[in-house]
Amino acid sequence: FLAGGFHLVRNPAAGLGLLGTGAWLYLAVAFSEELLFRGYLFQRLEKALGRWRTQWLVALLFAAVHWGNPGMTGSTRILASLSIAMAGLLLGLCYLRTRSLALPIGLHLGWNWAQGTLLGFGVSGIPNGGWWTPVFHGQPEWLTGGAFGLEASLPCALVGAVACLALARGLGGGNPANRIMGNSIK
């Protein structure tokens, strides 16, 4: 796309029903994962470990849960784990900013739906027949994410890191990078 790694072709077989079905599917995924990770687990661990240690632990567990997904091997595992952990940090920051699961659920739903149902990429290794279909141009997987999905790309990990830094601003004073790295644990 931006680096010439792929272009999108409209999928003529995809009707409007696909967009609604995908939304319901990814709502179920987002709701269940956020209820487990940011709802139950995060809130229980935060009392014992503090918010930043909990933030890192839950983000790493969130990434590890995806290790059994199709295509999660070799170099894909490294970049996908990094991006999924960044997503876990971002979703945790959304929870910390609002103290509500609505924003993490909405962001999680929106990302998965846009990536899979709308753009046709794999979502965490699960193939999708989307409204559009990505056609890859032989660029390396670390650039495009390949069949695994955008989470297996370096650009996704970098965007996740920038989003985390932006959202961490205002959560407890000091440098946002220090807060994310746990240097000012509260």
Identify what each model region corresponds to.
Residues F1-L35, F42-G50, R179, N183-K186:
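Juxtamembrane helix-loop-helix connectors linking adjacent transmembrane helices
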Residues L19-G20, W52-L57, S81-L82, A102-G106, ...:
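Hydrophobic alpha-helical transmembrane segments
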Residues T76-W142:
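Functionally important transmembrane alpha-helices
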